[in-house]
Each structure stands twice: as structure tokens, then as C-alpha cells.
Amino acid sequence: MAETAYVPRLRTEYDRHIRTQLTEKFGYANVMQVPKLDKVVLNMGVGEAVNDRKKAEQAAADLSLIAGQKAVITYSRVAISTFKLRENQPIGCKVTLRQARMYEFIDRLITVALPRVRDFRGLNPKSFDGRGNYSLGIKEHIIFPEIDFDKTGESWGMDITVCTTARTDDEARALLTAFNFPFRQ
């Protein structure tokens, strides 16, 4: 007897309902034309890591907890004297999520993390890049339930980029709205 593979809740929702909604709305002739989520990139810039490498390692550990996947420390490519930055110094960390981890992260972001943001009024609907990708910034990474602020001691901001296969911003906005992204009216 074969075991059934785990499928994230949002992936099931996409396969059952969202794909048909988008096909009806935009009139796609082929199933492969329907936009879908491609990847989610989490980026955390840690300016204090220039002086203390442990800050970058702590940020990478926190980002790994949030993403459920090991974070990669990013290094500077050029020296900038005004920031006292030399080449190949740690300046942040990043994670790229795909497949099941991507759907799980988006589910946690929408249902758990964003409602914990202070004075949250909704996501900016103008943060699309013109090619169907959406970016948002978070000021404190402690809104995620995986992070214990008492152990971390610091809070860093992070950038979240949701990459889709949509060709236009309208298609991407319809896709993300179907996934219950809370856009401002």
C-alpha cells in the first residue's frame, strides 16, 4: 500500500479552486498559461555584521528557523568606505523557498505573522515590479512564532519577494488575492 505524499493546504487550494478561477477571469486557452507561485526569496540585511560576524550568523540562524531551510550568509562584493565596508565581509543572509516549503511559508505569513504586525493596515498593492513579482518588507522578524525574542535579543527587518509565473501585475494581483494576501483597498 503506497503512502500518500503530503501536500500543503495552499497547494491543494490552488489545484482545486484558484486555477479555475483565474482561467475563467483571464480566459486562458491552456492550463500551463495559468499563473502560479514560482519561489519565495527571504532576504535579511544585517548592517551590524560588518563589525561583528556573529550578528550575521545569528540572523542566519533566525532566518533558518523562519524558513525551515538553511540560510546562506551573503557577502559584500565591493568596498564602500563610507560604510566602513570591505570586500567579502558578511552583510546579511538569504533563503530561497520552492515547492512545499514555499506554500507552507506563505500560509504562515498570511495567517499567523502578518496579523501580529503592529498597526497593520494591509499590504501595499503597488509593490509589484511590472513582471508579476511582489515584494514586501517587514520591520521586525519577531512576528514569526518560531522566533523567541528572549533568546534572540535583537530584531532585524527582512525583505520577502514572491515570484510568480504571471506576465502582468494584474494577473499576479489576482493570484495573490486568491491566496488571501491582505491588500489595502
Swiss-Prot record:
<dbReference type="InterPro" id="IPR020929">
    <property type="entry name" value="Ribosomal_uL5_CS"/>
</dbReference>
<dbReference type="InterPro" id="IPR031309">
    <property type="entry name" value="Ribosomal_uL5_C"/>
</dbReference>
<dbReference type="GO" id="GO:1990904">
    <property type="term" value="C:ribonucleoprotein complex"/>
</dbReference>
<dbReference type="GO" id="GO:0006412">
    <property type="term" value="P:translation"/>
</dbReference>
<dbReference type="InterPro" id="IPR022803">
    <property type="entry name" value="Ribosomal_uL5_dom_sf"/>
</dbReference>
<dbReference type="Pfam" id="PF00673">
    <property type="entry name" value="Ribosomal_L5_C"/>
</dbReference>
<protein>
    <recommendedName>
        <fullName>Large ribosomal subunit protein uL5</fullName>
    </recommendedName>
</protein>
<dbReference type="GO" id="GO:0005840">
    <property type="term" value="C:ribosome"/>
</dbReference>
<dbReference type="GO" id="GO:0003735">
    <property type="term" value="F:structural constituent of ribosome"/>
</dbReference>
<keyword id="KW-0687">Ribonucleoprotein</keyword>
<dbReference type="Pfam" id="PF00281">
    <property type="entry name" value="Ribosomal_L5"/>
</dbReference>
<keyword id="KW-0699">rRNA-binding</keyword>
<keyword id="KW-0820">tRNA-binding</keyword>
<keyword id="KW-0694">RNA-binding</keyword>
<comment type="similarity">
    <text>Belongs to the universal ribosomal protein uL5 family.</text>
</comment>
<dbReference type="InterPro" id="IPR002132">
    <property type="entry name" value="Ribosomal_uL5"/>
</dbReference>
<dbReference type="GO" id="GO:0019843">
    <property type="term" value="F:rRNA binding"/>
</dbReference>
<dbReference type="GO" id="GO:0000049">
    <property type="term" value="F:tRNA binding"/>
</dbReference>
<dbReference type="InterPro" id="IPR031310">
    <property type="entry name" value="Ribosomal_uL5_N"/>
</dbReference>
<comment type="function">
    <text>This is one of the proteins that bind and probably mediate the attachment of the 5S RNA into the large ribosomal subunit, where it forms part of the central protuberance. In the 70S ribosome it contacts protein S13 of the 30S subunit (bridge B1b), connecting the 2 subunits; this bridge is implicated in subunit movement. Contacts the P site tRNA; the 5S rRNA and some of its associated proteins might help stabilize positioning of ribosome-bound tRNAs.</text>
</comment>
<keyword id="KW-0689">Ribosomal protein</keyword>
<comment type="subunit">
    <text>Part of the 50S ribosomal subunit; part of the 5S rRNA subcomplex. Contacts the 5S rRNA and the P site tRNA. Forms a bridge to the 30S subunit in the 70S ribosome.</text>
</comment>
<dbReference type="InterPro" id="IPR020930">
    <property type="entry name" value="Ribosomal_uL5_bac-type"/>
</dbReference>
